[in-house]
């Protein structure tokens, strides 16, 4: 509040009169001075403030106020002194320091005080633009001496603020002042990418001046023409941009002058054009921009002029826009660089968009306006008139570009709306999402019949923004979507259009455009709208300034409520109606069902908001209007009471359309029928016609034909209603969503269809389909008739899929029915083939090469669906080359694989079926036929689905290649044996032809079994009667280029399981980190029962993607709990394998109804009860009861052998000795090789068995490792050995092969079982498996290159998974280096030890250095599992000193690493090898359970062996897992059996006796392979002993010659309890007895005679014990997992607190260092600076050289 001098005097007098003392009066002086300061009486104010200072001299406010008074009087010296005194009294006044610096620089820059105060202010305001300007003034006064410093200052400022226009201009001016024009031009080039600079008028002016000056300097240099042309190109672009900005911000005169300068530049460049180069392309584009800006300038003149002739100006402007629009788009390929191409492309789109819209704008409402303009002004006189209107100078016209340009060839070309829409999308990018530009475009489209493409515009600007949100009720900024922004733009355009109409109604000429050009028109949106749009763009593109984000979010959040019409939105009802109608119209024009549903759904949302307002208006009540609305209210468009009924009808139509889109057809029909309007009639006609089409897609019965007719009649009735209403009232035509012509065309088509039905249905005759010109008759109407364009109809939901989708579905259904029928027919043929010598074949039909006319292409697609169907049964797919067609071959050839039965297949498509001629003569499946047997042609196979196969080939003779049933394995050797002269034959009878030996071994073994069970298709290869017969038979030889691979069966992991339960649910997982439930997936939850072991598991896959989201066993310890607050959800905990590894998860399943939830609970409990009732899975359950005892006994003997083999593999100190014991007897032919060699990747040797099958069971007792199937004895005269090493006699089904990868999940475990049978199908000799022909490769493969890792000659002494970190000195913190296995390796030769670590998967080195004696490991502060050390590392190839840290998961592993690290240092000094540590044999994460649990389970599952003779052999098999874990250790993990024999095992577990465990070997034993001896049995004379030979790293195992010496340690171990154990492995025709040592103190339990019932009882009791232990183990594992999760959370919290503490300490250190350095800089050289040297050296960790330099600086030497 200001006061006058008189008021101040009265107030001062009253106060002084009441003051008791002069001092009291003086203390009021400050207040008096302020009163006089407001009255602008500065002298009186100084008087009173001085009296106050005399009393209160220490008041900094008074000194500051006095300085302000002196500054107003421009007394700078006294003002500075007062300010300085105020700062001394109160140093916190930072702004006053800057004020002093500004005053001193303003007064005298050369004053030394100015430099001091500027530097002081710079410390208080780092990076401030004001400080930069002050420093710039200081350096400017130094002249040329300060240029280098000024250049450095500008560069540093540009690094901080690259968008600052002043700094960029200052740098260019500095270059120009120093005559460095090339550098100035280069700087202009660099800044062109900056959008902020391109939108600055000052910067573009600077660029134009710089480029012009540079071009003038280049004119004298004739040699540098390319540089001159490039600079001219940049100058033209800069002129165009500057012209645009000048038109927007400056007056008409300045715009005229710039346009004339632009004209001169174009004229200068025109003389230098030549050829297709970058300058020519740019010149052409700039010509268009010149004329566009000329037209905008003419309209700008009319906007700002008085007594304007709008007609003359608009006609000249139209001429300019016509020229600009008809300039062709530039050839982008001529422009170098992607940035330049994008820029020119965007400028061209912007030019075409603005020019095209202005042409439509100027010619609106004027007939032949453009034609008149061209005829009047497209000549010399018109060009002169244009020149005179634009340029005021008297320069000759011929020397200007505008005066000399040829404008006589202009066409009267109005822009097409489709082209304009495309140009608009490109122009959006040029304006970077400016709301002004978007609003201007919307206004142009507002007066056009088509809708604006706002959706496409927004997609260009916000690529990743969702189209619609599911949370319309919220106002969170994160929920904003494309539809919100589209609604906003529609509202801005709507209100802006109404405002322009109000202005034009008051004073507007008919020739004045409603909307002026974009650079000329005023702001079209309000400030509130602009600020909201800018805030949205900033948040979405994440460009918010730090600290400003919260403010922007509040702004966006407030307006979202308005846009979504939530709460008190304050929107005008007319705007809501406009939004609803526009969205409904846009949605109907989209092709996607989802887009339609979202747009029409938002339209329904606004209709629901406006209906209550319509009721208020109906009652003639007023609607409140907000004071400052987001969208201004216009009373000219207020809804009247008479319009309410029409709007309500539109709303209900929209509701019905949404029902139709969502698939609720019946509801939509009911709603449409209740509305009596042409829109509802049209929609009903569409629905009924669609129903008729749905029925017409299939073969119709009489009832269906009648129903189809009724639908067509209803369609006809509604179409006739539309035509009648339009005849009576022409206004209803505007409401139709389609043109009236489309209605008439549709009615005509419906009438034609009804006539077809009445004439006897020519489409359907004799129950078969008519071949309509060999084409598929589409059920959709023709586009030329009444095809509903996307903008005129709506699509249907998945409940009622689109027409093409239903046609596809019907086609697929038809194909499936055909395939089913064909399979049934082939099955019948197969069954008949076993009873009759004549083999049923499909009749064939022969089409010659000319059966299809040239140029004809069959119907390849059916609404986009390929018409390729498989017509044969076998599931091996091979593609046929398109060149192998009947029109290209002289005779048909077998171009498909033998499993395909057709060679020349031709499709004839009709509306609902195919006629497929099949020709395949001579290539047969099934039982062989006589060579010259005649076949009679069969009748065509007829079926209901329309497939027909006709035979016109007559009788065929010949013998074909047969796929027989006598062998289960088909090889090419069988084909080669065929010697028939007339049939199809592989190869030639040439002695040099080697045939197919070795190729295709077991080629069809996986298919023939299925072929026997499925259909066998027979067909003859086609032969012409006499045309191609030769004297000799054809000997066709195929030389395959690439052998086809075997077909890979798709395995989903559910093959051997039965589905007990399946229901669609929504699965949730509890996230312990955020303490909330998260959705896991939506799909079918299944309970599967394993057919082998009977264990149930729970499996769930997500819909569509089929990703596993739940996969775990159902155990008896699991219990279902209802989820709180819901009776439709159950919760449980399980060890889940869905992500590959076992992980304890809390899961919850939500069902649709409580009944479904209760059904799931019952099924779950039944599965748990099933677990308790599972019978013991022993071999006697799987064989006939008559041989149970023998089979049980022999299966146990076989398992005993595998148990011994496991003991050998798990012996940690086993060494193989070379022994050979010769004996007599017969054995199987062939041997198996075993090689043990060091593996650089693992810590132990790799055991390789040729022809072996070693599979693992992953320590899961749930999977049965063997199953025995026995056939009757009468059918098995020769028994086969089921267990052997290497190749045995014929028919062996069990062999050791390479080990498979570990199965970790239940789905994988399900596949690990091996079923062994003795059926006749397996009676295949090894010779049959190996025969086949040899193919000479056309392109030989390159030699195998062995990959060297650099660790070949090194011994792994430590290996474990860990996390490596590296200390980064630059940022002062630890950074993760990688996760992988860290190894300690020792070289065998020089005994050097190094640490190597590679990252997982990529195997990139992240640590590689030698361990030296001076290295030391230290624990990191706060944890004992992290070791820190410093080393010269070579991981990146170069030597680099690194500070490393490694973190282990467990403490004992960390301790082990420390121990080995220390041993490595000692070993290098002693030049000795390090002994590998036992704890490194396996990592903790690979161990399924603890050592104690393993020992208990092994003792529980101790097995028995017996000595038997070799005649009766049971079929048995087992699975063994071999894993290499250490250099000297080869371990095997064997699935623990589920049964034990004898009571000692149970007694051993549950009693308190301290008996030592029974073992076949000792971990410390050396010199034995298995830990026991194989000795020849004394009872057998025909046995041979085996031996194991080891040489170096390889050992060979011969199964028939094996002698293993027993270690002496074993003889003394286990209390001498284990002495002798014997077993035998049965062989075919001969047996080999292996003697094991058994305990001597008590007879072996398995020697006792037990009945079957006793065995079952003992097995049952032991199994229950084992199950109890398993349950305890699982509970312990679950508890451990929960504890580990809690520990993990605690550790993460501790790490977070430690990081926060480190960051706080680091920030404090940096602040302290900054203060010390500032003191050092400002102190005088000498002792004061030297006192700070130790602190700086310590904090910066300077090198000696750096310390010396700093000391010199401290003394003032530098």
Swiss-Prot record:
Q: Where is the composition biased (Polar residues)?
A: 1236-1245, 1583-1594
- A single Pfam family it belongs to is Ran_BP1
A GO BP entry is:
NLS-bearing protein import into nucleus
Q: Which InterPro entries match?
A: GCC2_Rab_bind, GRIP_dom, PH-like_dom_sf, Ran_bind_dom, RanBP1-like, TPR-like_helical_dom_sf, TPR_rpt
Cystine bridges: which residues?
none
At what positions is Phosphoserine found? Answer: 21
* A GO CC term attached to the entry: nuclear pore
Keywords of the record, alphabetical order, are:
Phosphoprotein, Repeat, TPR repeat
Please report the residue spans annotated as repeat (TPR).
60-93, 584-617
GRIP domain: from which residue to which, for each copy?
1703-1753
Q: Which PROSITE patterns match?
A: GRIP (PS50913), RANBD1 (PS50196), TPR (PS50005), TPR_REGION (PS50293)
| Residue ranges, compositional bias (Basic and acidic residues) | 1595-1618
Asked if the record carries the keyword Transcription regulation, the reply is no
Residue span(s) of domain RanBD1: 1037-1173, 1334-1470
Q: What are the Acidic residues biased-composition ranges? A: 1318-1330
Locations of Low complexity compositional bias?
779-798, 1295-1309
Where is the stretch described as Disordered? 761-805, 1213-1249, 1295-1332, 1583-1621
What else the UniProt entry mentions is:
One of the 8 copies of RANBP2 clustered close to the chromosome 2 centromere.
Name used for this protein in its record: RanBP2-like and GRIP domain-containing protein 4
Which species is the source of this protein?
A: Homo sapiens (Human)
- Upper classification of the organism: Eukaryota, Metazoa, Chordata, Craniata, Vertebrata
Name the gene. Answer: RGPD4
């Amino acid at each position: 509040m200001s006061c006058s001098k008189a008021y101040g005097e009265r107030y001062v007098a009253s106060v002084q009169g009441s003051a008791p003392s002069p001092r009291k009066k003086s203390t009021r002086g400050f207040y008096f001075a302020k009163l006089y300061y407001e009255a602008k009486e500065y002298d009186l104010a100084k008087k009173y403030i001085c009296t106050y200072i005399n009393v209160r001299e220490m008041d900094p406010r008074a000194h500051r106020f006095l300085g302000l008074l002196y500054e107003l009087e421009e007394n700078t010296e006294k003002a500075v002194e007062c300010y300085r005194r105020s700062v001394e009294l109160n140093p916190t006044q930072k702004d006053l320091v800057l004020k002093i610096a500004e005053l001193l620089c303003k007064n005298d820059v050369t004053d030394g005080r100015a430099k001091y105060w500027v530097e002081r202010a710079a410390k208080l305001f780092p990076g401030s633009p004001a400080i930069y300007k002050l420093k710039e003034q200081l350096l400017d006064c130094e002249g040329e001496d300060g240029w280098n410093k000024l250049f450095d200052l500008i560069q540093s400022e540009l690094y901080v603020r690259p968008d600052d226009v002043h700094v960029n201009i200052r740098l260019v001016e500095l270059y120009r002042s120093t005559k460095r024009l090339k550098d100035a031009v280069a700087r202009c080039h660099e800044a062109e990418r900056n959008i902020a600079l391109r939108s600055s008028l000052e910067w573009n002016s600077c660029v134009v001046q710089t480029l012009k000056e540079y071009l003038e300097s280049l004119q004298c240099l004739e040699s540098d023409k390319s540089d001159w042309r490039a600079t001219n190109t940049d100058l033209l672009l800069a002129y165009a941009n500057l012209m645009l900005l000048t038109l927007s911000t400056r007056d008409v005169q300045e715009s005229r002058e710039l346009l004339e300068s632009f004209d001169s530049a174009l004229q200068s460049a025109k003389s230098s054009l030549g050829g297709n180069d970058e300058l020519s392309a740019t010149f052409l584009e700039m010509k268009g921009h010149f004329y566009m800006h000329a037209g905008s300038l003419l309209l700008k003149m009319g906007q700002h002029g008085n007594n304007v002739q709008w007609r003359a100006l608009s006609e000249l402007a139209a001429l300019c826009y016509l020229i600009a629009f008809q300039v062709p788009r530039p050839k982008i390929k001529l422009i170098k660089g992607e940035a330049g191409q994008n820029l020119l492309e965007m400028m061209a789109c912007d030019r075409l968009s603005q020019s095209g819209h202005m042409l439509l704008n100027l010619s609106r409402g004027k007939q032949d306006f453009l034609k008149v303009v061209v005829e009047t002004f497209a000549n010399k006189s018109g060009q002169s008139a244009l020149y005179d209107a634009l340029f005021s100078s008297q320069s000759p016209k011929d020397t200007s570009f505008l005066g000399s340009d040829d404008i006589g060839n202009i066409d009267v070309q109005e822009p097409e709306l489709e082209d304009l829409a495309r140009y608009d999308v490109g122009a959006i990018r040029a304006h970077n999402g400016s709301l002004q530009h978007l609003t201007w475009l919307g206004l142009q489209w507002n007066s056009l019949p088509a809708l604006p493409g706002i959706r496409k515009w927004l997609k260009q600007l916000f690529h990743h923004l969702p189209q619609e949100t599911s949370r319309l009720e919220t106002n969170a900024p994160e929920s904003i979507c494309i539809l919100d922004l589209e609604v906003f733009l529609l509202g801005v355009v709507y209100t802006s259009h109404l405002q322009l109409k109000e202005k034009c109604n008051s004073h507007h000429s008919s020739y004045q455009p409603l909307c002026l050009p974009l650079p000329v028109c005023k702001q079209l949106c309000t400030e509130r709208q602009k600020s909201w749009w800018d805030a949205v763009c900033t948040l979405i593109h994440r460009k918010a300034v730090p600290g400003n984000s919260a403010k922007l979010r509040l702004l966006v959040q407030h307006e979202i409520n308005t846009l979504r019409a939530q709460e008190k939105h304050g929107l005008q009802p007319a705007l809501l109606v406009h939004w609803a109608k526009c969205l409904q119209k846009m949605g109907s024009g989209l092709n996607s069902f989802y887009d339609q549903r979202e747009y029409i759904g938002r339209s329904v949302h606004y209709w629901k908001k406006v209906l209550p307002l319509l009721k208020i208006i109906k009652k003639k009540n007023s609607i409140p209007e907000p004071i400052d609305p987001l969208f201004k209210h216009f009373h000219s468009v207020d809804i009247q009471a008479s319009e309410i009924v029409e709007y309500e009808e539109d709303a209900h139509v929209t509701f019905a359309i949404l029902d139709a889109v969502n698939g609720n057809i019946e509801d939509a029909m009911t709603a449409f029928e209740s509305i009596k309007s042409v829109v509802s009639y049209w929609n009903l006609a569409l629905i009924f016609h669609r129903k008729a089409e749905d029925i017409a897609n299939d073969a119709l019965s009489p009832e269906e034909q009648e129903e189809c007719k009724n639908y067509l009649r209803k369609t006809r009735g509604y179409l006739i209603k539309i035509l009648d209403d339009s005849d009576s009232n022409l206004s209803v035509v505007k409401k139709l969503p389609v043109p009236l012509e489309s209605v008439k065309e549709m009615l005509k088509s419906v009438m034609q269809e009804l006539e077809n039905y009445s004439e006897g249905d020519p489409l359907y005759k004799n129950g078969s389909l008519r071949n309509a010109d060999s084409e598929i008759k589409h059920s959709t109407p023709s586009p030329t008739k009444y095809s509903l364009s996307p903008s005129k109809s709506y699509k249907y939901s998945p409940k009622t899929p689109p027409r093409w989708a239903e046609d596809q579905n019907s086609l697929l259904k038809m194909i499936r029915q055909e395939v089913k029928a064909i399979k049934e027919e082939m099955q019948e043929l197969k069954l008949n083939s076993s009873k009759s010598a004549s083999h049923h074949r499909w009749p064939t039909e022969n089409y010659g090469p000319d059966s299809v006319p040239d140029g004809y292409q069959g119907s390849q697609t059916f609404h986009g669906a390929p018409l390729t169907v498989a017509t044969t049964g076998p599931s091996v797919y091979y593609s046929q080359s398109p060149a192998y067609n009947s029109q290209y071959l002289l005779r048909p050839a077998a171009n498909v694989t033998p499993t395909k039965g057709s060679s020349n297949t031709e499709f004839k498509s009709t509306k609902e079926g195919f006629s497929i001629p099949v020709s395949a003569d001579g290539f047969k499946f099934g039982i062989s036929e006589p060579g010259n047997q005649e076949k009679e042609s069969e009748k065509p196979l007829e079926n209901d689905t329309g497939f027909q196969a006709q035979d016109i080939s007559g009788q065929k003779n010949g013998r074909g290649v047969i796929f027989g049933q006598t062998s289960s394995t088909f090889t090419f050797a069988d084909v080669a044996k065929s010697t028939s002269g007339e049939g199809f034959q592989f190869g030639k009878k040439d002695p040099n032809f080697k045939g197919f030996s070795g190729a295709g071994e077991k080629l069809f073994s996986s298919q023939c079994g299925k072929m026997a069970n499925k259909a066998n298709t027979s067909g003859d290869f086609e032969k012409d009667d006499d045309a191609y017969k030769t004297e000799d038979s054809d000997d066709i030889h195929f030389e395959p280029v690439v052998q086809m691979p075997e077909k890979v069966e798709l395995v989903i992991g559910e093959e051997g399981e039965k589905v007990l339960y399946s229901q669609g649910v929504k699965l949730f997982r509890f996230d312990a980190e955020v303490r909330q439930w998260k959705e896991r997936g939506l799909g079918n939850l299944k309970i599967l029962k394993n057919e082998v072991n009977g264990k149930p598991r729970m499996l769930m896959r997500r819909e569509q993607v089929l990703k596993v989201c739940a996969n775990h066993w159902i155990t008896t310890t699991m219990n279902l709990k209802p989820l709180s607050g819901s009776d439709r959800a159950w919760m449980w905990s399980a060890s889940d394998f869905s992500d590959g590894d076992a992980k304890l998860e809390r899961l919850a399943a939500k069902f649709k109804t409580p009944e479904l939830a209760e059904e799931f609970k019952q099924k779950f409990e039944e599965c748990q009860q099933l677990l308790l009732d599972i019978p013991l899975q022993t071999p006697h359950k799987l064989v006939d009861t008559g041989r149970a005892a023998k089979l049980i006994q022999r299966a146990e003997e076989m398992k005993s052998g595998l148990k011994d083999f496991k003991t050998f593999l798990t012996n940690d100190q086993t060494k193989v000795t070379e022994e050979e014991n010769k004996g007599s007897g017969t054995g199987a032919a062939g041997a198996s090789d075993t090689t043990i060699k060091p593996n650089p990747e693992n810590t132990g040797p790799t055991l390789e068995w040729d022809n072996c099958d070693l599979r693992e069971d992953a320590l899961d007792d749930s999977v049965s490792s063997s199953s025995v199937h026995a056939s009757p004895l009468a059918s098995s005269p020769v028994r086969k050995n089921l267990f052997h090493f290497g190749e045995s006699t014929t028919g062996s089904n069990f062999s050791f092969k390479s080990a498979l990868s570990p199965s970790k999940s239940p789905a994988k475990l399900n596949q690990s079982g091996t079923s062994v049978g003795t059926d006749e199908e397996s009676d295949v000799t090894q010779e049959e498996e190996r025969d086949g022909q040899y193919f000479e490769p056309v392109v030989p493969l390159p030699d195998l290159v062995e990959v060297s890792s650099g660790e070949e000659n090194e011994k792994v002494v430590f290996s474990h998974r860990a996390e490596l970190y590296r200390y980064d000195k630059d940022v002062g913190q630890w950074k993760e280096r990688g996760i992988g296995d860290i190894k300690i390796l020792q070289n065998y030769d020089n005994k050097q030890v190094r640490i190597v670590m590679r990252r997982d998967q990529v195997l990139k080195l992240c640590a590689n250095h030698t361990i030296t004696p001076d290295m030391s490991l230290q624990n990191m502060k706060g944890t004992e599992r992290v070791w820190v050390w410093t080393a010269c590392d070579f991981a990146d190839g170069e030597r680099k000193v690194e500070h490393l840290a490694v973190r282990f998961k467990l403490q004992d592993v960390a301790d082990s690493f420390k121990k080995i690290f220390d041993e490595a240092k000692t070993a290098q000094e002693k030049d000795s090898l390090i002994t590998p540590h036992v704890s490194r044999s396996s990592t903790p994460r690979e161990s399924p359970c603890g050592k104690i649990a393993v020992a208990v389970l092994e003792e529980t599952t101790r097995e028995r062996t017996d000595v038997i003779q070799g005649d009766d052999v049971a079929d048995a098999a087992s699975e063994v897992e071999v894993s290499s874990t250490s250099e000297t250790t080869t371990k095997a993990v064997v699935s623990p059996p589920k049964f034990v024999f004898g009571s000692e095992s149970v007694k051993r577990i549950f009693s308190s006796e301290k008996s030592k465990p029974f073992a076949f070997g000792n971990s410390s034993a050396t010199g034995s392979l298995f830990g026991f001896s194989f000795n020849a049995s004394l009872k057998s004379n025909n046995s041979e002993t085996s031996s194991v030979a080891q040489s170096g790293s390889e050992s060979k195992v011969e199964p028939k010659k094996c002698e293993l010496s027993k270690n002496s340690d074993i003889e003394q171990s286990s209390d001498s309890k284990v002495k002798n154990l014997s077993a035998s492995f049965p062989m075919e025709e001969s047996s080999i007895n292996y003697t094991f040592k058994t305990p001597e103190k008590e007879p072996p339990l398995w020697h006792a005679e037990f009945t079957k019932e006793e065995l079952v009882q003992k097995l049952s009791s032991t199994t229950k014990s084992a199950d109890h232990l398993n349950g305890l183990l699982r509970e312990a594992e679950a508890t451990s997992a929960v504890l580990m999760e809690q520990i993990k959370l605690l550790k993460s919290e501790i790490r977070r607190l430690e990081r926060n503490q480190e960051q706080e300490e680091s920030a404090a250190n940096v602040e302290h260092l900054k203060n010390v350095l500032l003191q050092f800089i400002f102190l005088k050289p000498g002792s004061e600076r030297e006192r700070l040297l130790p602190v700086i050296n310590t904090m910066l960790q300077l090198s000696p050289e750096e310390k010396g330099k700093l000391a010199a600086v401290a003394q003032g030497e530098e």
